[in-house]
Amino acid sequence: MRIVMKFGGALMEDAEQISNCASLVAERAKKDYEVVVSVSAMSNVTDQLVAMGESARLGDMERVRITIAEIEQRHIETAEKLCNENTLCETKENTKKLLETLNQCLTGIFLLRELTPRSKDLLLSFGERLSVGLMRGALIMKGVNAMELTGGEAGIITDSNYGNAKPLLNITEVMVKDRLLPVLKGGVVPVVTGFIGQDENAVITTLGRGGSDYTSTILASALEADEVWIWKDVNGIMTADPKIVSGARTIPTLSYAEVMEMAYFGAKVLHPLTVTPVQERRIPIRIRSAYAPKNPGTIIRETGDKAKIVKAVTSIRGLSIITTGGAGMIGVPSVVSRVFSTLAANNVSVVMISQSSSQANISMLIHNSDLEKALKALKVEFRNGDLVRDIHTIPKVAVVAIVGEGMRGTKGVAARLFNAVAEANGNVLCISQGSSELNISFAVIEEDVDKVVQSIHSAFGLDKA
């Protein structure tokens, strides 16, 4: 059996946790499983790298030196607890070489007083490049032969859209098979950096937010793995955020489509793109707890359990509604096109859309941080006032969504949903539902989110087995 295991930053916090992760790998590797491992940076290191980039750009190299020293001490001390005598020397040497290169990168940013997307990708890559050596050392200590590789060295080839690079899946499949299959056949566990690839010019790129999970499914698809196991510090995917709903439960089974909807609408589980590489090959993804490895967690596959009409309720905070209106919009398709083209040109991401049937107005939910520039751009675009006469906003709102394949063709779901919202004294500001009937999403004032989510969770019996 061939599996890809992914370990996130929360599980790479210290020597004890990394050793625990290595034990999970070793257990399978010693049973003749072919295992590929993908790891994130140690917890908080990526944030430190981001902060150092800003410090260097602003000329504060003293802060940079202090932080590099902290990172070096943490990684060396962790290596000393994880590695045997033979691998410790090598791991220490590699760590110091990487940190020297990191210092050179930051010195360049300091001298130019500029942090380009390409430079930032290089900078952010160091977290994972440092952590793979620790995992390799821990595996060797447990009697597992392992080798470390960057995503690019493993064969993940991307475009050159630095900061959010897209994998070139056809080339990647060929390269990953060529580089990793001989390693696996030789009984070696490849430990691959999550989050990182390289473009066709061998320049390091990053896959954007959620990139480490994405790496694991890219590798699984290319290698035609049997399963992907994404290890986390929770027992799978929950029916709601347990910080909001104390009775939230683990969902045993989800479909690819359901988990993509959940991820898009705020469930902090997987990036929606994570599913894409494995969906066509029908490779299951398991979300499991590294602290309770016997717990089955959640399995994501082609079809979920349709017995439950609604599987989960999710939410996204920190949003604003921006509405464009005017009689001139009626029957003029180009107006909507101009609205979205204007927002796209200003790098404003639209989370949700709701349009009146009269076509006289369209409401869009965007992130609070984008509100000012979106409002300014739309006012400039429609300054003549002949088509769009009114542009108004509602700040501090949130989207709440219910997700489930069982909603398709089931009567009365919307009625139950909005009865639950009313019972929580929530006020629905706008609504959106796609023809797939996989979700119903709506906006409420942000301060009402918790009570609305709790009421919906109870109304659909999500706290019951």
Spans of model-derived segments:
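Acidic/polar residues at beta-strand termini and the immediately following turn/coil
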Residues: 241, 289-291
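A conserved regulatory-domain signal marking ACT and ACT-like small-molecule sensing domains
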Residues: 294-465
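Residue-level detector of flexible, active-site-proximal loop/helix-junction positions
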Residues: 153-155, 292, 435
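Acidic/polar loop patches that form or flank catalytic/metal-binding clefts of enzymes
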Residues: 271, 282-289
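Conserved dinucleotide-binding and phosphotransfer motif residues
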Residues: 31, 142, 281, 346, ...
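Structural motif
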Residues: 2-3, 34-37, 76, 145-147, ...
